[in-house]
Amino acid sequence: MIDGQPITLGGREFVAPPVPFSCMRRFADVFEGRASPTVEVMADIVFAALKRNYPDLDQKTFEDECLDVGNLNLAFMAVMQASSAREADHPGEA
């Protein structure tokens, strides 16, 4: 399991790791601060990160059973914190 931020979504415990590079590249405008993420983009980013630790996670089931209006921002912030914390702790590490 990849280290990250612990988070409870829909009554399930998850560890939200940093986003994979492919996700960062896909949503570069969000990660570089050139655009604000839409709700759909936030959900996609959260799912991409969690999929690293939970490969059997299904996106539709995850969005229907775990994400909701009350926790999407929290989940997104946990993923973003995990992504920036990893970068700050290990600068230049490949």
Model-derived features: where do they sit?
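Charged interaction scaffolds used for protein-protein
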Residues: 1-13, 21-37, 54-94
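A short, charged
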Residues: 38-55
